[in-house]
Amino acid sequence: VSEAGFATMAEEWQQCLEASDANPLFMSWPWLYSWWETWSQVLGMELVLLGVFDEGGQLVGIGPFCRRILVTPARVRVARLYMLGNAWRLAPTVRTEYCEIIARRGYEENVRTEVVSALEHLKWDELICSDVPGNQLENLKAGGFDDQLNYRIIHRTEDIGIRIDTAGCFDRWLNALGRNTRLKTFNRRGYLRKLGELVFRDYDDSRDGDFFERLNAFHRARWGKPAFDREALRFHRLLLQRLDLCDGEAAMSLLLCNEECVSVLYDIVVRDCRYNLQAGYEEKFNTKVSLGYIHLGFAIEAAFRRERTNTYDLLAGTGKNEFYKSHFHGNAVHFSTFQVVRSPLLKALYNIQAASPPLVARAFSRRIGL
């Protein structure tokens, strides 16, 4: 599929996605096209978008990839394929989770086989699969990415996300939390209300100003850098303009204490799931209160109260001091990042790296540029 075709296939893409089990936000046309529009030229990417069609011309599968030619400091030329939405070790773009090949239900095996076959005929030295669900490596192997092709698969990172089932009763979920988590998430509301008026409300641009400016200000104060740089801001603004194409809506919210905004939360709802993308708050507001927990508690409660929302997804990533998401009585989702290496030279270099002591391996990697 060409770049021009990618730009105009929103409806066809979404029909295929809705008939699949792929993630409805991260694998949506609004998310991936906004990512491509934002970073493709900045990073010098070439689109490698594979479409699989049935005999009637219906789109039944999508292999979303892009390619970049790298020349390492050691003058090694590497043709690297990426799954669309991530630029592993290249640039800190937004994080795209649940990356996978999209296949209409009933066509999974055919799509997997066709995509792997197409990849075999393309020119590339290694393929980077970032933040893919746990079953995707097995899917690639089943499609032919195994030892028979003499590819080497290198596991790089494993990460965990948390999904909270919000189809049930909020009070039952709350009571199942640990005592300290329940205190920080819910019970501290009473303490805050003794200090003054506490308000959780949806963001309104005409009333509340620029949401992302507020978010970035909180992050600069806490982390020393904004949550979203210039490109990331462009991406999120484009995404929000296109959310209706994937039946999504923004769920941005503010937490006010005595009419002062002390916390912001950036969520997006698509289909029956609410995704927690980012948050920012006044860290030194009160030593007895974690505003991040309090605000998240309000948002999770809102997901429970909304009839059509069955899941609140905290996504992958840890907090500043601990993996706080594990305390929220949710289900773990496992993500993998791995390389599929085809180039004999790269396989040899990675073998040297793997066989070396850690300090030597790091020095070798820096010198070669792996």
What do the predicted segments below correspond to?
Residues E259, G292, A299, A303, ...:
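Hydrophobic, well-ordered secondary-structure elements that form the walls
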